[in-house]
Amino acid sequence: LELGVERLILGSAAVKNPELVKEACAKYPGHIAVGIDAKNGDVAIEGWGEGSGVAATELAKKMADYGVATIIFTDISRDGMLSGVNSEATAALARACGVPIIASGGVASLDDIRNVKKYEKDGVAGCIIGKAIYTGAVNLPDALKIAAAKEE
């Protein structure tokens, strides 16, 4: 971070070594994000290979208490499936912890981006688009226009 990196994202460390996250937040306030990958509300770790037995909501609240700037929430069941973003679960997580959440997993169309945008007031700060861009299902300039649009 001393070299100018804007944000550091920690993943499994949030479950396996939460003190590391706490220390990083104290040393670099506003620059630490946590990735929470979950299926049916249970946080997965080690590249989704293991369940943790930790509820996503509880982990998000703990990370908020530590001072993380952002949480990237991946609904594992939707990632790469082009099946739509789990906007409701993402918004519920944002409301529960009070930290801006970036949705990850499931974007299939511009309508998904519009849907995520509806939850800005709940604390959903944006979404990650992967496969939908590679397949051409989402045009990046159009997606950026939707993301930049002011709420009506």
What are these regions, as identified by a protein language model?
Residues 20-22, 44-47, 82-85, 113-115, ...:
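Short, well-ordered secondary-structure micro-motifs
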Residues 1-4, 19-20, 88-123, 143:
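Catalytic cores of alpha/beta
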Residues 15, 19, 54, 58, ...:
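Conserved active-site and cofactor/substrate-binding residues in soluble primary-metabolism enzymes
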Residues 42, 78-83, 109, 135:
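Short, small-residue-enriched loops and turns at beta-alpha junctions
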Residues 13-14, 36-38, 84, 99-111, ...:
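Glycine-rich beta-to-alpha transition loops that act as phosphate-gripper elements at the mouths
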Residues 1, 21-27, 117-127, 133-152:
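C-terminal helical cap(s) of enzyme catalytic domains, especially alpha/beta-barrels
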Residues 1-79:
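Conserved anion-binding
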Residues 34, 71, 93, 116, ...:
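Conserved, mostly hydrophobic/aromatic
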